[in-house]
Amino acid sequence: MNKKYFYLLFTLFITIAVQAQKPTLFMGATAHLGNGTKIENAAISMFNGKIDMVADATRIRIDPSAFDTIYRVHGKHLYPAFIVPNTTLGITEIDAVRASNDYQETGSINPNVRTLIAYNTDSKIAKTVRSNGVFIAQVTPRGGTISGQSSVMHLAGWNWEDAALR
């Protein structure tokens, strides 16, 4: 049951923060940073879909008028999104079905292969992985001496242009 509430809060956290015109502030949560540190009673600000501030709320002064919305999330834990490196996520669906495998070309030297344009934003697997906290993937081709060019993609996007991380 706690897992369900965590995913609901996390989805709300991302959805609301992306739509705001001014920064959105989340107060009081325990922030787990990517380097392993933990900040109790954190103040987390998001603007245009990106985290622009993570600080200890007891050590900074916050102007409430600078934020569009302030959420009090005391007792909750917030984690950064995960990044999966060196994967075929989005360029393969079912390994047993050759037609759904876009990760390998014939021949051993294929520097022209670009996973950027082969990425499938409608992948069912990517949606499942995204619901577990993975939001960015390095999609990499396989096979051969020179396999091609990898791409770093957002798992949320309408097409490959939207999904490309630039």
Where do the model's predicted regions map?
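Short, solvent-exposed loop/turn and secondary-structure capping segments
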Residues: 37, 56-57, 82, 92-97, ...
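Active-site loop-helix segments enriched in His/Asp/Glu that coordinate
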Residues: 130-166
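N-terminal post-signal-peptidase region of extra-cytosolic proteins
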Residues: 66, 119-123, 138-139
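Histidine-rich, glycine-flanked metal-binding segment
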Residues: 35-79
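Short N-terminal segments immediately surrounding and downstream of signal-peptide cleavage
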Residues: 22-38
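Stable alpha-helical elements in mature extracytoplasmic
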Residues: 122-125, 130
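Bacterial Sec-dependent N-terminal signal peptides
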Residues: 1-23
